[in-house]
């Protein structure tokens, strides 16, 4: 049998980890692992004997179906149980006593162990001993009985011309072992358990190494191919192709990898079962950018060798095995196995055992990005009039009542009817490009141009965006440019402190992962290419940029303290202008939203460039919601009252980073709020009115409109990124549903086209007074013959009557366009007053201002709805009718007159731009 890939993984670990016995088998006894800390990444080199060193260890197993799973039975990170502690042997040598493999790891019956997996670390995890480039360490485990292993000490199936290595063959019992290279016998010995064969690669090319062991009539064989390469040669064609993979007109494929300071690069792929070949050897092109040298490696593989669908990786400098930073899809050896076929049908299986270091693979299919767009033309809403719904796909849908993190983009698609009825006109998706793991917020990116498969396929994402556009909803992507996960290829390609792409230490105060060197030209090129790719390929409508404070040049921060990070920073302004220019090259009207949360001077400079800036009013919103007057001023919902250029902020009460208002009400609300659910929901609606009815764009964090009260924080105050309970059943509670209806009404008023001038950012002054308490708060805006007055009663007890200067004379000239659920406000035009119960709000407008009311079937104009015996009938249709439950699920579609059987409940019927809400009993 030939186990080339198993051999390669054994080779990687041999110098860094040795074993007794060698080779290992499932039934080996008294197993001891020896860790050589001065090999690999040398992260634990030269530690004193007194240091507590631990192994984070698991196993790769194959189950009865033949499926291989990686890193099973590993403990939680930083488990310092005694069984994982290593014993000091001598300088840079430590040992871990395992004994019986299956017992040590607790391997289940029916599973076969294929590899041991290791990351060595200090007790606090701040130092790690890993493979070269930060790779995990793997040791092969052979089946029981007579077995043969073959290794060579290389970190990849590539070696340098004129280099000498030693091939080591080991058997589990005495045997005759013979080794040949390209058909020529190099050595043979009888009655041995090990054969070492030194070998020098005299010329470039492919070397097929074969080994045979014979014992007692049993024969085992192993084989591997080693590609010997010289340092790369300069390409005669100095053209630099697009980074990543390009399919050419003749069916060939060109690969291009940027790797400054490197000497060689070989692309290795599935087209020949991950054997390195001469066709994958790259040439290089050098160029200078701003006086700095840069190197690009490229090769073109003919159509006859490679076609259709394949996966690949790069071996750089014979040492570093990395994926493609520009991959459009990634195969993950650790997490793909947890993605079900219902989420990603036909997901290619990671080739366990065939790729060194469990390297992430780039996957390409000529058709994987194909999609037939249905919405051929979409006009995005004006950037000053956005009501954005911030969505984490993971938790937006999934198993109701459970926190399983199994939401998907297709399940979100099925809820778009709910969001359309809610009235929002933009969705901001938390990061959806490939991030580490499947359960995440996505702020740990590793491949910026690949969708994360945990939520669905590329076509699923496109279908979601397409449908949003059909519904008039823009789609904004949250992107993370300040940091990357350790799986990013450019992070793995260099040793710490020698990486031009990443800073060894972040220059700013808010770093979490690996900090990008923003001024490095190739980093900027990556951002340009990434932004333009998503605009063109997925037709997104803009971006929200995470932690803009971390996007300054290294020398722009006086130090890494918070004060220096918060200070005005011209380089951040310049960088965001450059990124905006990249976006504008594709779509001049694309949204460009900064999470900067900096001073007015810096943000107003960004605003001059047409950028929007987040405005965080969570603290004030929480104070108001809980019933505290102090620090509850919400006037900054209007940009001009925050010292910002009018119309240039996205102001919000909640975001993924902030605590839920409802949670704080439950925990710390004043008497009369805490423990009073109806009052709490009314106050949340009153807070929403102070946000939505102010000029400029605003944002709703998912389920704020339902009064979701799940905490988003850990006990230490940091973000809790664990899955949250899916709680669509909140809409079954009258008070929560009433809050949602308040949001719906307010958004309808805010975004109705005929009301646009009421909320124009050019109105000076806009009549908002949102800092008072005892005497109430008010919003007043007029335009031509339209008037809108919103009165909010912050008091926990007692109604208030507030003077209002109505311009018309009769009560019949006005109506209540929106009010808190369960409240009974009143207005008297002659007296010039509005009376509002405690905790509540009311919006009084002239009757020519659109609001939201239940539309009786008789008033449905071109088509009518009737209900009888559990069915819902629609007549007079001129366009398809879509029926949605109040939870947003699609209950049916009628392409012509007809009926749909539905359970009892409230439904929205939508057709030809008109919506009708009916109750089925």
Per-region residue spans from a language model:
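C-terminal outer-membrane/trafficking sorting elements
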Residues: 11, 853-921
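Substrate-binding/active-site clefts of carbohydrate-active enzymes
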Residues: 15, 334-335, 370, 374-386, ...
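Aromatic-rich carbohydrate-binding modules that target alpha-glucans
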Residues: 47, 51-110, 123-133, 245-249, ...
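Solvent-exposed segments in extracellular or luminal domains encompassing
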Residues: 191-206, 899-903
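Basic K/R-rich, polyanion-interacting modules in nucleoproteins and related proteins
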Residues: 227-266, 323-385
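Conserved alpha/beta catalytic core and glycan-binding cleft of carbohydrate-active enzymes
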Residues: 539, 562, 566, 573-713, ...
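C-terminal beta-strand-rich structural cap/linker in extracellular carbohydrate-active enzymes
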Residues: 830-850, 907-912
